[in-house]
Amino acid sequence: MSIVALIRDARADEAFALEALQRRASDVWEEYRAQLAAHPDAITPPHQAIAEGRVRVAVDAAGRRLGFSTVLPVHDRRCELDDLFVEPEWMRRGVGRVLVHDLATRAHTAGASYVDVIANPNALGFYTRLGFHVTDETSTRFGAAPRMTLALPRSATRPEPR
């Protein structure tokens, strides 16, 4: 049974709360703490993405935010997962998986055949378990990162973990 009771669109009044969630989730990776502290502009409130309906929030039965995802618009049958962050105490409990399933369903409905992500190297196993595969490596402001792709089945609405 999932701890996620609902996935909903983010509201404008929670942009700063989502920014704080992203900071807490990012701080679990010790190797990025100093870089994020030196570049606080790397994490900003997702005002524009919220206004465009591209941010989804997973909440529990009490309405607490457990995590969120941000996607870029579908272009050329591809959708890019731009952000996926889960509260540290809820990591490894299915929240990220449920958010990816939600975005895959929505991307498929919007006409996408693929979901792309530039993955944190620490999350490579997570994405691989959901069916993503490495297609390339790219540079980010914090170093090299794998570019990964998930092919969306034509008839299925969401990926299943392997």
Which residues are covered by each model-predicted region?
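Glycine-rich ATP-lid loops
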Residues: 88, 92, 112
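Conserved catalytic-core motifs of GNAT/GCN5-like acyltransferases
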Residues: 116-118, 133-150
